[in-house]
Amino acid sequence: MKKKAVILLSGGPDSTTVLEIVSKMDYEIYALSFNYHRRNSPEVQKIQGLIKDYNVKQHRVINIDLQSFIGSALTDDNIDVPKFKHTDQLPSDIPVTYVPARNTIFLSYALGVAEVIGARDIFIGVHTNDYTNYPDCRPEYIKSFEAMANLATRVGVNGEKITIHAPLINMTKEQIIKKGLELGVDYSKTISCYDPTEAGLSCGQCLSCIARLDAFKKNNVQDPIKYV
């Protein structure tokens, strides 16, 4: 009988690469996505097409309201998503696109689902380029959440172990794209943009788009998605 795994799936290249990696392992896959603001709606739409390429047992889309976390460009309509032209313009501190407690909320949902379905493995697509901008992507955070998960659940108290896997955590965006291309990931079905159009076109100028374009460029590959 296959072990069960919960994967946090955003529709971006990182979590899709994780899905590809896990699909080649001996797991029954349960994917978990979140619809939390109009700006991430195109991500959720992309996932519907993406998920068909994989043997996913179940895909859940959870609607949550993060608009109470004002101050983030990803949840507050009154804040514009910053735009850039080059990677050397990208912020070196925590940007306005940081959403307070987002990964903690997402991982908590994943933990709850894992307990319900009997999974002991949770996968997330954080990586080295996330460390500076997003504190809830750091290795220390992942380890701390795993420790909490094993203290705060029936599974953990009963002596079983829940593991938070971050297979990309020591990889750069460039390395992730290279790995995904080698594995056969169809990146045309992914989206990274923080500020996409209603038609789902990427802006090409937000932090996430610039980082994505740079990663493909460094791999000497044309990014297959459409930009404005």
UniProtKB/Swiss-Prot annotation:
Documented EC number(s): 6.3.4.20
GO biological process terms held by the UniProt record: queuosine biosynthetic process
UniProt-annotated binding residues for ATP: 9-19
Keyword Glycosyltransferase: no
Known pathway: Purine metabolism; 7-cyano-7-deazaguanine biosynthesis
InterPro entries: QueC (IPR018317), Rossmann-like_a/b/a_fold (IPR014729)
NCBIfam families reported in the protein's UniProt record: 7-cyano-7-deazaguanine synthase QueC
Family: Belongs to the QueC family.
Name the record gives this protein: 7-cyano-7-deazaguanine synthase
Name of the gene encoding the protein in the UniProt record: queC
